[in-house]
Every structure is written in structure tokens, then in C-alpha cells.
Amino acid sequence: YDRYEVVYR
């Protein structure tokens, strides 16, 4: 991933 905003949902 590069989306470390939505990874930890």
C-alpha cells in the first residue's frame, strides 16, 4: 500500500 490513510480503518 501507499495509502496510509485508509489502510488502518
Curated annotation (Swiss-Prot):
Disulfide bonds: none annotated. One of its GO terms (cellular component) is extracellular region. Expressed by the venom gland. The keyword Magnesium does not apply. Its main location: secreted. It is found in: Secreted. Keywords: Secreted. The keyword Transferase does not apply. Belongs to the non-disulfide-bridged peptide (NDBP) superfamily. Short antimicrobial peptide (group 4) family. This is Venom peptide 3. It comes from Tityus serrulatus.
